[in-house]
């Protein structure tokens, strides 16, 4: 560890990239505490003190914004609009042939898809900012009767929408700059920072409300979950590939053997985001349709509140688990293209020895991916995502469970990816030094 740090210090270029990354992350965190224009900050503090901002609508989004959502700051939307836009653009490759064509055009096509993602991020940010401003106008955003805006005029609402949308675009710009000029994937690092920022407050809340015994249990569960996630994320199925010998001029090429590494969790955390987004819709309906004057809500609102108002009901848990499994299978099926992989192998004289009994190469690849995804990957994601929900029901902690499976899954994945990129850059500079 100390040797690695010493090598980084002796590499000025890499050190500048790390300093640039940490600087933008620090600015991002400071922006989480800057109130948006037109927001009545004392009213926000009173509503937060009342403790009504709990539940599925808040916990997941607030986790990705590093607490900025409940502060109604300029970065309240966080990185979620960009994540949603990226997922939508990726899924549109299956529906729109033009998007698939752009994806295959490599650098030029990727630049066009990135531009589409930015436009969609702007549209989603405007939509979410308008929703937040409407809820803040009545106080329903934080579950209290106090309006969170200085006044309910259209101008004030418009200023809040502009401030929140601009904040989202600034966060997107931070992420792109980190990816281009810093270390690691910028968007992933911002998510990592937002999740990590909520850990101290979450753990402190567990100690205050549940005691040190429950705190020790939570830490133990978090450590075991982290070890399990590292093991699964680094696991892979290696499909052997053999290349036949070919005669090109006077040279004989090929004849080598390699493998296709297939990760156990190919979908990463995207199915969890899908499932959480779907199950946040009932919470949004509850917030919009719950009377603020204390009168009884409609029967269907009562029914939604009973089953989907929090994450500790068995119906919510079962539906959440099934959605994750379904989305995992769906996402892997549209992102992993066995036909394309098979064509690329045939173009260079490659084949899979084990595919002969199972038929064509693409059918064998589809068979292997289906087994890995459904038997291991989907169940693994479902179990990991269920950890905080089970904790809500068993130990009675709040919705802001600090060491939930989703948060640890994201942090471990981003951490491993960043460490690998730093190591790769260090090795690259080491070999460049030898060549000189």
Swiss-Prot record:
Q: Name one GO biological process term.
A: protein transport by the Sec complex
| Key word Mitochondrion present | no
Its placement in the membrane is given as: Multi-pass membrane protein
Decide whether keyword Membrane is in the record.
yes
Q: Which Pfam families match?
A: SecY
Q: Where in the cell is it found?
A: Cell membrane
Q: Which GO terms describe its cellular component?
A: plasma membrane
Function description: The central subunit of the protein translocation channel SecYEG. Consists of two halves formed by TMs 1-5 and 6-10. These two domains form a lateral gate at the front which open onto the bilayer between TMs 2 and 7, and are clamped together by SecE at the back. The channel is closed by both a pore ring composed of hydrophobic SecY resides and a short helix (helix 2A) on the extracellular side of the membrane which forms a plug. The plug probably moves laterally to allow the channel to open. The ring and the pore may move independently.
Q: Which NCBIfam families match?
A: 3a0501s007
| Subunit structure as annotated in this protein's UniProt entry | Component of the Sec protein translocase complex. Heterotrimer consisting of SecY, SecE and SecG subunits. The heterotrimers can form oligomers, although 1 heterotrimer is thought to be able to translocate proteins. Interacts with the ribosome. Interacts with SecDF, and other proteins may be involved. Interacts with SecA.
**Name of protein:** Protein translocase subunit SecY
């Amino acid at each position: 560890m100390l040797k690695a740090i010493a090598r980084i210090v002796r590499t000025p270029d890499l050190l500048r990239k790390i300093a640039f990354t940490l600087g933008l992350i620090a600015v991002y965190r400071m922006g989480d505490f800057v109130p948006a224009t037109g927001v009545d900050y004392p009213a926000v503090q009173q509503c937060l003190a009342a403790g009504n901002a709990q539940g599925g609508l808040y916990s997941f989004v607030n986790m990705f914004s590093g607490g900025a959502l409940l502060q109604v700051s300029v970065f309240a939307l966080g990185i979620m609009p960009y994540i949603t836009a990226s997922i939508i653009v990726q899924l549109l490759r299956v529906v729109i042939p033009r998007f698939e064509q752009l994806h295959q055009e490599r650098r030029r096509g990727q630049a066009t898809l990135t531009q589409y993602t930015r436009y969609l991020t702007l549209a989603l940010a405007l939509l979410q900012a308008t929703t937040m401003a409407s809820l803040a106008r009545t106080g329903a955003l934080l579950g209290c009767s106090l309006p969170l805006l200085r006044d309910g005029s259209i101008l004030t609402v418009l200023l809040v929408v502009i401030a929140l949308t601009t904040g989202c675009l600034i966060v997107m710009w931070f992420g792109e700059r980190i990816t281009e000029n810093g270390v690691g994937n910028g968007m992933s690092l911002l998510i990592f920072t937002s999740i990590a920022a909520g850990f101290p407050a979450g753990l402190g809340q567990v100690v205050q409300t549940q005691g040190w015994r429950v705190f020790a249990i939570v830490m133990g569960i978090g450590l075991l979950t982290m070890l399990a996630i590292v093991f699964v994320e680094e696991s892979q199925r290696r499909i052997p590939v053999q290349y036949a010998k070919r005669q090109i001029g006077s040279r004989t090429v090929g004849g080598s053997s390699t493998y296709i590494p297939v990760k156990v969790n190919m979908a990463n955390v995207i199915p969890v985001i899908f499932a959480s987004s779907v199950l946040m819709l009932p919470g949004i309906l509850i917030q919009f349709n719950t009377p603020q004057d204390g009168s009884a809500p409609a029967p269907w609102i009562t029914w939604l509140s009973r089953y989907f108002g929090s994450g500790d009901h068995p119906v919510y848990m079962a539906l959440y688990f099934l959605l994750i499994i379904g989305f995992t299978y769906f996402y892997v099926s549209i992102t992993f293209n066995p036909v394309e992989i098979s064509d690329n192998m045939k173009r260079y004289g490659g084949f899979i020895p084990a595919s002969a009994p199972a038929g064509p190469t693409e059918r064998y690849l589809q068979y292997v991916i289906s087994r890995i995804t459904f038997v291991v990957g989907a169940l693994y994601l479902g179990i990991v995502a269920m950890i905080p929900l089970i904790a809500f029901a068993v130990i009675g902690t709040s919705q802001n469970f600090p060491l939930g499976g989703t948060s640890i899954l994201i942090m471990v994945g981003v951490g491993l990816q960043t460490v690998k990129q730093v190591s790769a850059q260090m090795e690259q500079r080491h070999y460049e030094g030898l060549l000189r």
